[in-house]
A protein has these predicted regions:
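N-terminal helical cap/lid subdomain that shapes the substrate entry/recognition surface
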Residues: 1-50, 68-71
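Short, contiguous strand/loop micro-motifs
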Residues: 2-4, 35-39, 57, 92, ...
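Residues at structural and domain junctions
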Residues: 5, 16, 38, 60, ...
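Asp-based, Mg2+/Mn2+-dependent phosphohydrolase catalytic module
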Residues: 28, 53, 66-67, 71-178
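A short, Lys/Arg-enriched amphipathic alpha-helix followed by its capping loop at the start of a domain
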Residues: 50-59
């Protein structure tokens, strides 16, 4: 099962996409099951909250997961109220077509009325930044050690690489105030 999951993730950008293509798996049931996880290890991130609050820019969540999963993560981090459901573009909004597909990116841009040339696109999966770069975004990869996350991390579609999101948000805020 783990091998199948990994293979589908690599080939189809999400395990769900592969399961839908090859096994007609209902996406809502899969997402509910796979996102039923213990998040008690996560703590409120007061530094990130402060930086998000002080950064005078619109902020959105663009996820290959469900909106409910994003809500759970953001709630555990203590920042959900800074976004809310209306600031989340999830896999259901994408018609279950995952990032980095152009169609999905374009739907997200349309939903939020974003101008990609005025957008900073931050991702933990490097290859997902490719379409943002093509559309004109400043792309930022949040460095991590996950094998799939760092695939394509050496490509030129990545404008910046960061290790600390809160510090990066602070740097953006300080640059904007100059």
């Amino acid at each position: 099962a783990k091998e199948l999951q990994t293979n589908y993730f690599y080939k189809y950008n999400t395990s769900l996409n592969g399961l839908m293509i090859h096994h007609n798996i209902p996406p809502q049931e899969f997402l509910k099951y796979v996102h039923t996880i213990d998040l008690s290890f996560m703590r409120e991130d007061t530094v990130m909250r402060r930086e998000l609050e002080q950064l005078d820019m619109e902020k959105f969540i663009f996820t290959n997961g469900s909106a409910e999963h994003a809500e759970n993560i953001l709630t555990h981090l203590g920042i959900y109220d800074l976004f809310g459901r209306d600031k989340v573009f999830d896999i259901e909004d994408a018609g279950y077509v995952p990032k980095p597909e152009a169609k999905t990116f374009d739907l997200m841009v349309k939903k939020f009325g974003i101008n990609p040339k005025e957008t900073i696109y931050i991702e933990d999966i490097a290859k997902n930044l490719s379409i943002g770069h093509k559309r004109g975004c400043t792309t930022v990869w949040l460095i991590n050690d996950e094998h799939f996350g760092k695939m394509d991390a050496d490509k030129d579609f990545i404008s910046h690489k960061i290790e600390n999101l809160s510090l990066f948000l602070k740097e953006i805020r300080l640059l904007k105030s100059q």
